[in-house]
Amino acid sequence: MDIKEDDESRVITPTELQLHDSVTARTGTLWTAVAHIITGVIGAGVLSLAWATAELGWIAGPAALIAFAGVTLLSAFLLSDCYRFPDPNNGPLRLNSYSQAVKLYLGKKNEIVCGVVVYISLFGCGIAYTIVIATCSRAIMKSNCYHRNGHNATCSYGDNNNYFMVLFGLTQIFMSQIPNFHNMVWLSLVAAIMSFTYSFIGIGLALGKIIENRKIEGSIRGIPAENRGEKVWIVFQALGNIAFSYPFSIILLEIQDTLRSPPAEKQTMKKASTVAVFIQTFFFFCCGCFGYAAFGDSTPGNLLTGFGFYEPFWLVDFANACIVLHLVGGYQVYSQPIFAAAERSLTKKYPENKFIARFYGFKLPLLRGETVRLNPMRMCLRTMYVLITTGVAVMFPYFNEVLGVVGALAFWPLAVYFPVEMCILQKKIRSWTRPWLLLRGFSFVCLLVCLLSLVGSIYGLVGAKFG
């Protein structure tokens, strides 16, 4: 039988979200904001930080981590001032999303550019997660093989991860039929717990390796390359990996919208950002520096799948299993906004088309007779998206290179350019004054770094594919 789209399954429009938000009680505090930020930034990106630190060396590696922390914190301060409009302290209009703020301050064209960058970033995360989950699944099998047959055994399990990527893609085709983001709270919670678990295991294993070695590995210049030009591009690729891990600009205004007042939301948000960035940086230092200190020039691109650790094999397996569970949920967290935007656009453009607007109900015995609602457009669109991300991952299964490209593409526009431009407009900073020059200079330097990181990451991606 067919069922008309009901309130639960349809896509909510921005106007309805704003009306719904206006009657929502805001009870958030400093510590809930800190928790939201930390949960949002601790993810698969931490697995590459040891490699990035190793490529940069003992001086440039920690310095880069601190520099990106400073840029992220400044971005958070600028963005938190844009939450209320037009006055940052008492403005009557609250902006509860990043895109909404960009549209109001910078106009429709900038909102479109912002949306394109966001969706490219989310798409890139889906590709990266597909690569990582295949690597981790294969690592679990190899770990058990090494434990049974010795560390010198031939445990290849094929020459690539394509089989595991296809399995993950099939799983995500099913998972992608979850109606919308509001039905995924449990999935996000599991993903957050898993990300912290495997990150702490990685730190613990690296620290144990340092104690076992009784020395700190590594050098000031980092891992040597074949020539100076090669080293330069790898360094910029490493910066792209760090850029992927740090920013939380996209979720900042949504978190700020949960805060109660007084005190003013921007004050609480700035304090929360400071605490969160401090914790984040300390955590990233542990992941990056402990990993490099443990393995030196042999630091793997992915700390938990490069087989620097063989024992305890059960703990290595458990860490990789946590990554798998995290990425099953994490893939959906990054994919659902793309699904929602595409479906909202098609529904608005073709409201009477049955293929797009009609839902069909089926009763499944396994669900105790409950009716499952399926929409043909949703099934086709989401399946096609999963197939594309899986296909790209199979074509370019290079973890660090893909992270570098995604990080370099998204960091400057989302964490620097838009916050700076909105701040200049909101505070009415006049051209060629000292604050204007400082903000524009800051934005320009970050742009140069991100462009070089993008070129370095693309160079590495092409080299890995065709070299």
UniProtKB/Swiss-Prot annotation:
InterPro entries: AA_transpt_TM. Keywords: Amino-acid transport, Cell membrane, Membrane, Symport, Transmembrane, Transmembrane helix, Transport. One of its GO terms (biological process) is amino acid transport. It is found in: Cell membrane. One of its GO terms (cellular component) is membrane. Residues 1-29, 80-111, 253-274, 334-383, 426-443 are cytoplasmic. Residues 51-58, 133-163, 206-231, 296-312, 465-467 are extracellular. It is a multi-pass membrane protein. The chain crosses the membrane at residues 30-50, 59-79, 112-132, 164-184, 185-205, 232-252, 275-295, 313-333, 384-404, 405-425, 444-464. GO terms for molecular function: symporter activity. Amino acid-proton symporter. Stereospecific transporter with a broad specificity for neutral amino acids. Belongs to the amino acid/polyamine transporter 2 family. Amino acid/auxin permease (AAAP) (TC 2.A.18.2) subfamily. This is Probable amino acid permease 7. It comes from Arabidopsis thaliana.
